[in-house]
C-alpha cells in the first residue's frame, strides 16, 4: 500500500514522504490515527506544496534569526547593574534569564524570550564579565558578554 505521511513516524519517514507499507499497518494504524493518507496524484501535489511551504518558512526563520544575531552582536558587551552586591563582589542571589533579556532590551537590542537564553551551568553569582549564550534558531546561536556591575 502506498501512503503519503502527514506526520513524522519513527522508523518510517517524515512529513510528505511517500512510503510503501503492508496493507494491515496502513489500514489499521497509519490511516485511522491520521498519520498518513492514501497516495494519489492530488495528494502528492498537496504534499509537495506543504513541503515547499515548510522549507520557505524554515528559510525565513533562519534569516530572521541571523538578523537578530547581527543586532545582538552590534551591542558588544551588555551591562547589567545589580543592586544586591556584597563588598566582596558576590551577589545576593544570582542572575536570571529574565535579567539578561531586560539588559539586552535596555541596551537597545531586540526583545527576546527568556526561554532562549542559556545561562552557564554554574550560576552567575559574582560581579564581572560572563559569556551567556542565546539560542535563536536550531542553526543560529550568539554569545553575549554580560558585564555584571554593582549599582550605585
UniProtKB/Swiss-Prot annotation:
GO terms for molecular function: rRNA binding; structural constituent of ribosome. GO terms for cellular component: ribonucleoprotein complex; ribosome. One of its GO terms (biological process) is translation. Coiled coil: none annotated. It holds the Pfam family Ribosomal_L9_C. Keywords: Ribonucleoprotein, Ribosomal protein, RNA-binding, rRNA-binding. HAMAP family: Ribosomal_bL9. Binds to the 23S rRNA. NCBIfam families: L9. Belongs to the bacterial ribosomal protein bL9 family. This is Large ribosomal subunit protein bL9.
Amino acid at each position: 500500500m502506498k501512503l503519503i505521511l502527514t506526520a513524522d513516524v519513527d522508523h518510517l519517514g517524515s512529513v510528505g514522504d511517500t512510503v510503501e507499507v503492508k496493507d494491515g499497518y496502513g489500514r489499521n494504524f497509519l490511516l485511522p490515527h491520521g498519520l498518513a493518507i492514501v497516495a494519489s496524484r492530488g495528494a502528492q501535489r498537496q504534499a509537495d506544496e506543504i513541503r515547499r511551504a515548510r522549507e520557505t518558512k524554515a528559510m525565513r526563520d533562519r534569516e530572521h534569526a541571523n538578523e537578530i544575531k547581527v543586532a545582538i552582536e552590534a551591542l558588544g558587551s551588555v551591562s547589567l547593574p545589580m543592586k544586591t552586591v556584597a563588598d566582596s563582589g558576590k551577589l545576593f542571589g544570582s542572575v536570571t534569564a529574565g535579567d539578561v533579556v531586560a539588559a539586552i532590551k535596555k541596551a537597545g537590542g531586540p526583545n527576546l524570550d527568556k526561554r532562549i537564553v542559556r545561562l552557564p551551568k554554574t550560576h552567575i553569582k559574582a560581579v564581572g564579565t560572563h559569556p551567556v549564550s542565546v539560542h535563536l534558531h536550531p542553526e543560529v546561536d550568539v554569545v553575549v558578554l554580560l558585564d555584571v556591575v554593582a549599582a550605585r
